[in-house]
Curated annotation (Swiss-Prot):
Function: Allows the formation of correctly charged Asn-tRNA(Asn) or Gln-tRNA(Gln) through the transamidation of misacylated Asp-tRNA(Asn) or Glu-tRNA(Gln) in organisms which lack either or both of asparaginyl-tRNA or glutaminyl-tRNA synthetases. The reaction takes place in the presence of glutamine and ATP through an activated phospho-Asp-tRNA(Asn) or phospho-Glu-tRNA(Gln).
Keyword Cytoplasm among record annotations: no
Coiled-coil regions listed in the entry: none
Gene Ontology molecular function: asparaginyl-tRNA synthase (glutamine-hydrolyzing) activity; ATP binding; glutaminyl-tRNA synthase (glutamine-hydrolyzing) activity
Name of protein: Aspartyl/glutamyl-tRNA(Asn/Gln) amidotransferase subunit C
Enzyme Commission no: 6.3.5.-
UniProt-listed NCBIfam families: gatC (TIGR00135)
Enzyme class: ligase
Subunit architecture: Heterotrimer of A, B and C subunits.
Family (UniProt): Belongs to the GatC family.
InterPro entries reported for this sequence: Asp/Glu-ADT_sf_sub_c, GatC
One GO process term, biological-process aspect: glutaminyl-tRNAGln biosynthesis via transamidation
Length: 95
């Protein structure tokens, strides 16, 4: 499957991306390479191959949740450049 420049432009519009002419050319080539690779993968005979989610056997690495103590407010704010009472103070980012 060969991807066209028009298809790349369409995908860019859907993603609300403004691409330059050079970027369109670059992405058209890159997406074409990716689709060619996927076509090769689709052509592989995987009959009789057991589906796996990991290439190597893995066991659940989760640990049990255990409640532990936390540091106090003063220790948490010890190195804060700005603070207001018991809170971190940060620059305003929304007008």
């Amino acid at each position: 499957m060969k991807i066209t420049r028009e298809q790349v432009e369409h995908v860019a519009r859907l993603a609300r991306l403004e691409l330059s002419e050079a970027e369109l050319d670059t992405f058209t080539g890159q997406m074409d390479s990716i689709l060619s690779y996927v076509e090769k993968l689709n052509a592989l005979d995987t009959e009789g191959i057991v589906p796996t989610s990991h290439a190597v056997p893995m066991e659940n690495a989760f640990r049990a949740d255990e409640a532990t103590g936390s540091i106090g407010v003063e220790a948490a704010l010890a190195n804060a450049p700005l603070r207001a009472e018991s809170f971190f103070r940060v620059p305003k980012v929304i007008e």
